[in-house]
UniProtKB/Swiss-Prot annotation:
One of its GO terms (cellular component) is plasma membrane. Keywords: Cell inner membrane, Cell membrane, Membrane, Transmembrane, Transmembrane helix. InterPro entries: UPF0208 (IPR007334). HAMAP family: UPF0208 (MF_01101). This is UPF0208 membrane protein SG1605. The lineage of its organism: Bacteria, Pseudomonadati, Pseudomonadota, Gammaproteobacteria, Enterobacterales. It is a multi-pass membrane protein. The chain crosses the membrane at residues 46-64, 70-90.
Amino acid sequence: MSTLPSGSVSWYKIFQRGQNYMKAWPAEKSLAPMFPEHRVVRATRFGVRFMPAVAVFTLTWQIALGGQLGPAVATAIFACSLPMQGLWWLGKRSITPLPPSLLTCFHEVRQKLNEAGQSLAPVEGVPTYQMLVEVLKRAFKLLDKAFLDDL
């Protein structure tokens, strides 16, 4: 993830790209050994769903018991930051160019989709993980699940 495309992307856009990447990621267990995204997406979805409740519970518990508010606020902020960290990582990952090993897989899957009669838009620029996810999602929808065995 050290080689990002030139041009700065605002932090808000990175979070948006992270959400789009998370929504586009195919929920196929066969991808879990190859990509860390499967685990990150599941953890981020869990965090988005439950961490705000954990933060509210922590604050309420400390206020109700007359405890110190400082540690409770720190815990609540930490709990709310966990899903944001996942979205940030996914956003950065989505704009990262593919390494050479995945680049060949990307082109092979595109070729299989073309052979299956699917029209694909030409690749503009260097392929990124977002482009790979879109191709994989389409391949899982239209091709036989065994297409991963050939890669």
